[in-house]
Amino acid sequence: MVSILDSSFKSKTEKKGAIVLLSGGLDSTTCLYLAAKDFGYPKNKKLPLLALSFDYSQKHKIELTKSKKIAKTLGIKHVIQKLDPGFFLGSSLTESKIKVRKNAKSLFSGDETEIPNTYVPGRNILFLSFALSLAEGHGYDSIYIGVNALDYSGYPDCRPEFIDSFQKMANLGTKKGVSGTGDSIQIKTPLLHLGKKEIIELGMSVGAPLGLTHSCYDPVSGKPCGKCDSCILRAKGFLEVGLKDPAL
């Protein structure tokens, strides 16, 4: 793992670079390859991108191994930032005493009235804040995040309203945002209004290595459980596309 303080992270290209939040999952990997396309990939192989991942003692830490491999496919720099797990209490993804919900009947019924226990308190707020500070300090002009509001409507930090509010905060709370030059750091969410089927199709169209991705919240010996919300949504997406999941 490379230090964030490495001066080589500074974006020196005419078209300023981007930080991409990369979990190692299907959505963030597709988002990464869309960012790469925005910067001229595959014709341009020297991409001004920095992949940023977080180790917060999540149960599915295998996603970090996947994120390393995915970043290497583009030859871009990759940082894994360690966070104290005490930041993220009250979630089934971080606390062993809380079981990840399985086979949730409300997932597709429209009866979801409560926030799932897989929600991690303030996670995207913290992740985006780290990325924003890193972007401003190192000269990147945008941040890509692969949230989508349709599949994860139960998560408050995946909604369009949240992204809009964070963009306003970035405009008001950074030097770039208040400089009056009109070049504030932009939060880009290319998957925000897409379902899993559309994300899979989009990922395939830009050459994203979906076979390297990991989505399961509660893996068993590194293998998907097949029953958590994320596994079910992923399986449904590939079924609708009519393809076998390349990660299985």
Swiss-Prot record:
Gene Ontology BP term (one): queuosine biosynthetic process
Enzyme class: ligase
Cofactor-binding details, from the entry: Binds 1 zinc ion per subunit.
Catalytic activity: 7-carboxy-7-deazaguanine + NH4(+) + ATP = 7-cyano-7-deazaguanine + ADP + phosphate + H2O + H(+)
Residues that coordinate or bind Zn(2+): 216, 225, 228, 231
Keywords: ATP-binding, Ligase, Metal-binding, Nucleotide-binding, Queuosine biosynthesis, Zinc
Pathway assigned to this chain's UniProt record: Purine metabolism; 7-cyano-7-deazaguanine biosynthesis
Cofactor(s) needed by this chain: Zn(2+)
GO MF annotations in UniProt: ATP binding; ligase activity, forming carbon-nitrogen bonds; zinc ion binding
EC number per UniProt: 6.3.4.20
Residues engaged in binding ATP: 22-32
Tree of life domain: Bacteria
Matching InterPro entries: QueC (IPR018317), Rossmann-like_a/b/a_fold (IPR014729)
Family in the record: Belongs to the QueC family.
Cited function: Catalyzes the ATP-dependent conversion of 7-carboxy-7-deazaguanine (CDG) to 7-cyano-7-deazaguanine (preQ(0)).
Stored NCBIfam families: 7-cyano-7-deazaguanine synthase QueC (TIGR00364)
HAMAP family cross-referenced by the UniProt entry: QueC
Name used for this protein in its record: 7-cyano-7-deazaguanine synthase
Species of origin: Leptospira biflexa serovar Patoc (strain Patoc 1 / ATCC 23582 / Paris)
